[in-house]
């Protein structure tokens, strides 16, 4: 027998020491202790209900597991690499504490369905927590939008000045992204929140278990329908990693803008000192380390997605040891996403907006040129002709170092006799912004309406 191994009956030689270290997962899967114990308690209660094991053994098992939980949370539990993983560490300790009753716990289950349960329980809780962090970030964005409700800034395409927009409208763009992220997390929860326990190693179990009872005890709305798929499925983890990658992409895009906006060239915003660092050599520096690091961590999350996809891509049914590699990418992504969301929500809430700088930038770069074209269209000119006229007026302004509002009416009429003095009212920043009143536009009225809609939870 391989000494001290709960599976060692078939073996005549001990496990190689380095193999033992190489194959152990306890260093990282010990974070599943709470889920493992919770699942074992539910399994034990079901075994007792079904009279598969005696009720007195069930009570010993439950009491022993609760004591082990207390020991782990008090930092008094010594994890052993020789016991490989969290499941064997807990089961071995349980048997040492309560004797033969502890050895009955694993009746009717395998580590294959046990670990599938633990991961689903763990991810289920984390999905709820990540959704709550997304709510905090959305609240920070809405708060900034409300504080700066009428602040005008340049909108960009190709990072070139395009049209004036409200800063609040820009914040609401990220609100939409993070609301979609929350929706994806909620969808992922539906496919995560399914009980796999009862699948056994791969084919089910010969014992008369009651899977639906375990599902009820663990708050799962349904059970898996195929034992092979139950133990080999990691789609729910992959789906989360994909959703997390999109979420981090949104944070990375936002980070890029915050980094640009905080430069001395833009000066659109000031990030709080608490979210920046200095230079070891340049005394004047205030570096936006937080958004830079979030931007960098995005690649890490992408890598975790690719790592698990690559692990799973060639695995035959059912369980394979390769699948031990599912946990570190999952755990690392959860930690990264939660940390990034928390720090981002706090940073955005404390961010200061330089309103005059934004407005002055919006007034440059011919940002109201489209409004001139729209003005001519309303006067009866076809849009393509209007586009040509305004393009020529912009070229004239560039050559004469002027902006559109600085043109005299005589100069305007040189481009089209349709233009009259009312052109000046049409190309103010406020007029440009507020003319875009359709749903989803940047008008002040529309932005206020959108903030109210999101605040109402719609």
From Swiss-Prot:
GO terms for biological process: arginine biosynthetic process via ornithine; L-arginine biosynthetic process. PROSITE patterns: FUMARATE_LYASES. Its main location: cytoplasm. One of its GO terms (molecular function) is argininosuccinate lyase activity. This is Argininosuccinate lyase. NCBIfam families: argH. Pathway: Amino-acid biosynthesis; L-arginine biosynthesis; L-arginine from L-ornithine and carbamoyl phosphate: step 3/3. It is an enzyme of class 4 (lyase). It comes from Geotalea daltonii (strain DSM 22248 / JCM 15807 / FRC-32) (Geobacter daltonii). Signal peptide: none annotated.
